[in-house]
Every structure is written in C-alpha cells, then in structure tokens.
Amino acid sequence: MLPCLALLLLMELSVCTVAGDGGEEQTLSTEAETWVIVALEEGAGPSIQLQLQEVKTGKASQFFGLMGKRVGGRPLIQPRRKKAYQLEHTFQGLLGKRSLFTEGREDEAQGSE
C-alpha cells in the first residue's frame, strides 16, 4: 500500500508540473529540481519482502511445474507406491532407462521361437 501511495504522489507531482507550464517553452537547466523522498517505515519492509517472496515462489512453480521438477522440496504429483510384485529393477544406460525383467522376457520369447 505504501509503495503505491508513493508512486501515486510522484505521478501527481509530474502531472502538476507539466500542467503548470502554461505554454512556456521548456529549456534544460543546470539548476537542481525538487525531489520528493519517501522513507519506508520499519514495519513496512517485511510485508513487502513477504509479497516479493510469494511472487517469486509463484513464478518458480509455474516454470518448474512445466518441467516436472519439485518446488519447495515437495513433489507436485505424489507417486503411488508399487506393491512387491510390481517392482522392477531398472538401470540407466546410454540408450535410456531399461527394465531388467522386460528385457529378459523379450529374450526368452525370441529364443523360444
């Protein structure tokens, strides 16, 4: 709320200076212009930081959600546990993941033909 108020105040000042020219020609000057400095209160800092953290987390979840990665240490999709008879041993080779049981069955099927 406070940053919005400061931004609104700065916008009003710029509109007032442009409207107050009265058609005079603007020239560049080396004189110092009036600046408005707004100091944030000590209590306002953590709430702004919390809002920024929420925005960052939201962007990260959108990005990593597309890639199937975990955000914040929790999996997006909870995998179901496999029962003992459904477990298969897999290994990572140059051609990708392979199942030991599936390859063995294919070899047996080809050998019996």
Curated annotation (Swiss-Prot):
PROSITE patterns per UniProt: TACHYKININ
Residues annotated with Leucine amide modification: L95
Signal sequence annotation: 1-20
InterPro entries with a match to the protein in the record: Tachy_Neuro_lke_CS (IPR013055)
Main location: secreted
Propeptide feature ranges: 71-79, 98-113
Keywords: Amidation, Cleavage on pair of basic residues, Hypotensive agent, Secreted, Signal
Residues modified as Methionine amide: M67
Cell compartment(s), UniProt: Secreted
Tissue/organ expression: Expressed at low levels in the uterus of both pregnant and non-pregnant women. Isoform 1 is found only in the adrenal gland and fetal liver. Isoform 2 is found in heart, liver, bone marrow, prostate, adrenal gland and testis. Isoform 3 and isoform 4 are expressed predominantly in adrenal gland and placenta.
Domain of life (superkingdom): Eukaryota
Single Gene Ontology BP annotation: regulation of blood pressure
Molecular function in Gene Ontology: receptor ligand activity; substance K receptor binding; substance P receptor binding
One CC-aspect GO term: extracellular space
Protein family membership: Belongs to the tachykinin family.
The protein's name in its UniProt record: Tachykinin-4
Organism: Homo sapiens (Human)
Upper lineage: Eukaryota, Metazoa, Chordata, Craniata, Vertebrata
